[in-house]
C-alpha cells in the first residue's frame, strides 16, 4: 500500500483577464461520490486535457475521469500569455536558442507535433480564430543588445532552414503604433490562443466522452490492491492508472522534490478601448503579439473583439517557496506594468488596468521535464519549462502513450532526456534564483 497526502493545493493569485472575458461553455460538475475508472487524469490544464484526449483516442472503450482542483480556465493554464511557439523558447537563458542546429530542429519538431495535436483539437471542438489563431509572433527589440539577440536568433533559425523576417523600426511602428521598438524578428509558426477559452472549449469538447470534475482537489493519492484511490473532500476516484498533469505541483504529490523551480510571472490587462480611429492610431493593428528579444523582458499582446481592444502585458518574475503571492507584491507588479505600458503607449495612459494576476511557471535547471512513470501505474507529465501551451501539451500526449504502451518515434525522442537537476536547498535557492532573476532583469533594461 502506497499512501500520499498532497502537501499543498493550487492558489489563484488575482483574477486573470483572460478568464474574466471568457465564457464558460458547459456546466460545472463536482466530484461528490465514489467513482471507478480505468484511467484518472489529475489536472485539467494543457497536459491533462491533452492526455485525456489522447487516451480517448487510444482506449475509446475504457472509462476516463479528469479532475481539477479549481474551475477550468481559472488556474495556471488560463493565466499565460497564449503563445504556442514552434521555435526554441528557453527561458533559462536570455537567448531563446542556445543549442546547435540539430538540437534546434529536434525541439521544433516536438513543438510542431504538439501544435498539430492542438490544431486538430481546435478544429474538432469548433474553436474560433479568436481562440486559436495561427498568426505568428514577433520578437521585439528596444535596445541595441536586443537587436543583437534577434540577429543571433535569426542566425540560429537560418542554420536550421527556418523562415523568419526582420522588421525595422518603421515596420514595428506600423504594427504596434509605438515608436518604442528599434526592430523585430517575425516567425510565422506560432499560434496565438485565448488561453482561458482554449482550455474551456477543449474540456467542453471532451465532456461528452469522459467525466470531468472541477473544484474537486485531490487531497491524497493512495495505492491499494493494484488500484489508485484519489480522495477529494466530497468524493473519490479509484483507477488502474493515473496521469498527473499538475506541473510544479508534482512535488506536492511527493515526486521530484528539490529539483523544480517555482517561478511566478505577473501580468495585467487593460480595460477595453475603442478599436477604431483612436485604437489604431495609438496601438496599431487590431491584433499583434510581441515577445521580448531578451527573455526577461515584457511580453505584450493586443487583442480586439467586437470593436473593443485590450492590451495584455506580462513582465517581472519572482521565485517563491509559497503558492500564494501577497497583495503588496501584486500591487508593486501592477505599478511595474503601468510603467512599461506607458513607456510604449503614452497615449493609453488614461486607460487603466482592469485585471492584474500572477501565474506559476515550473522550470528545471537543465531544462528537462518532470516526466515518466514515477510509481507503478502513476505517470508524471509535469514541468513545462516556461512554455506550458506547447511543452505541457506534448508531455500529456507522451504520458498517455507511455501509460498505454504505445510506441512511436516521438515518444522515443521525448524519453531521451535526463532527470531535472537538483537545485540548492532553501534558503539558498530563494536567494540565488531571485538574485539571478534580478540581474537578468537589469540586463534586459528597456526590453522589460
Per-region residue spans from a language model:
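Extreme N-terminal leader/targeting segments of oxidoreductases
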Residues: 1-39, 57-58, 62
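Glycine-rich FAD pyrophosphate-binding loop
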Residues: 56-79
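Dinucleotide-binding Rossmann-like beta1-alpha1 core, especially the glycine-rich loop
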Residues: 87-169
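Short beta-strand to alpha-helix junction loop
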Residues: 106-112, 140-149, 185-204, 213, ...
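Active-site substrate-recognition segment that forms the wall
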Residues: 116, 124-132, 218-220, 236-276, ...
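Helix-loop-beta segment of a Rossmann-like dinucleotide-binding subdomain
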Residues: 128-139, 171-201, 316
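Helical element adjacent to the flavin cofactor pocket in flavoenzyme catalytic cores
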Residues: 155, 180-240
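C-terminal catalytic lobe of FAD-dependent flavoproteins
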Residues: 318-439
Amino acid at each position: 500500500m502506497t499512501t500520499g497526502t498532497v502537501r499543498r493545493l493550487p492558489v489563484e493569485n488575482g483574477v486573470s483577464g483572460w478568464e474574466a472575458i471568457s465564457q464558460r461553455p458547459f456546466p460545472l460538475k463536482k466530484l461528490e461520490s465514489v467513482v471507478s475508472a480505468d484511467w484518472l487524469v489529475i489536472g485539467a490544464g494543457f497536459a491533462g486535457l491533452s492526455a485525456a484526449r489522447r487516451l480517448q483516442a487510444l482506449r475509446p472503450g475504457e472509462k476516463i475521469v479528469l479532475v481539477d482542483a479549481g474551475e477550468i480556465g481559472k488556474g495556471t493554464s488560463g493565466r499565460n500569455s497564449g503563445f504556442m511557439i514552434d521555435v526554441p523558447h528557453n527561458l533559462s537563458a536570455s537567448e531563446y536558442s542556445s543549442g546547435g542546429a540539430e538540437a534546434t530542429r529536434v525541439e521544433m519538431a516536438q513543438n510542431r507535433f504538439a501544435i498539430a495535436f492542438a490544431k486538430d483539437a481546435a478544429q474538432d471542438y469548433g474553436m474560433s480564430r479568436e481562440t486559436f489563431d495561427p498568426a505568428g509572433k514577433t520578437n521585439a527589440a528596444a535596445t541595441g543588445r536586443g537587436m543583437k539577440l534577434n540577429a543571433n536568433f535569426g542566425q540560429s533559425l537560418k542554420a536550421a532552414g527556418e523562415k523568419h523576417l526582420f522588421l525595422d523600426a518603421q515596420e514595428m511602428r506600423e504594427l504596434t503604433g509605438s515608436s518604442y521598438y528599434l526592430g523585430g524578428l517575425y516567425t510565422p509558426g506560432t499560434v496565438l490562443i485565448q488561453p482561458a477559452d482554449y482550455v474551456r472549449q477543449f474540456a467542453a469538447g471532451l465532456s461528452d466522452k469522459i467525466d470531468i470534475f472541477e473544484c474537486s482537489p485531490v487531497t491524497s493519492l493512495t495505492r491499494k490492491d493494484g488500484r489508485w484511490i484519489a480522495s477529494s473532500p466530497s468524493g473519490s476516484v479509484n483507477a488502474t492508472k493515473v496521469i498527473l498533469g499538475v506541473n510544479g505541483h508534482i512535488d506536492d504529490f511527493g515526486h521530484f522534490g528539490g529539483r523544480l523551480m517555482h517561478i511566478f510571472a505577473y501580468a495585467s490587462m487593460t480595460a477595453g478601448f475603442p478599436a477604431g480611429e483612436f485604437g489604431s492610431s495609438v496601438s496599431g493593428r487590431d491584433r499583434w503579439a510581441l515577445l521580448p528579444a531578451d527573455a526577461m523582458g515584457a511580453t505584450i499582446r493586443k487583442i480586439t473583439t467586437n470593436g473593443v481592444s485590450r492590451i495584455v502585458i506580462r513582465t517581472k518574475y519572482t521565485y517563491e517557496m509559497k503558492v500564494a503571492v501577497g497583495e503588496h507584491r501584486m500591487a508593486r507588479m501592477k505599478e511595474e506594468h503601468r510603467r512599461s505600458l506607458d513607456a510604449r503607449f503614452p497615449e493609453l495612459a488614461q486607460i487603466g488596468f482592469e485585471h492584474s494576476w500572477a501565474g506559476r511557471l515550473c522550470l528545471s535547471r537543465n531544462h528537462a521535464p518532470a516526466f515518466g512513470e514515477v510509481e507503478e501505474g502513476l505517470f508524471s507529465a509535469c514541468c513545462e519549462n516556461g512554455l506550458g501551451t506547447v511543452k505541457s501539451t506534448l508531455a500529456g500526449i507522451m504520458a498517455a502513450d507511455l501509460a498505454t504502451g504505445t510506441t512511436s518515434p516521438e515518444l522515443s525522442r521525448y524519453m531521451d532526456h535526463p532527470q531535472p537537476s537538483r537545485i540548492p536547498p532553501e534558503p539558498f535557492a530563494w536567494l540565488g534564483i531571485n538574485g539571478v532573476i534580478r540581474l537578468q532583469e537589469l540586463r534586459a533594461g528597456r526590453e522589460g
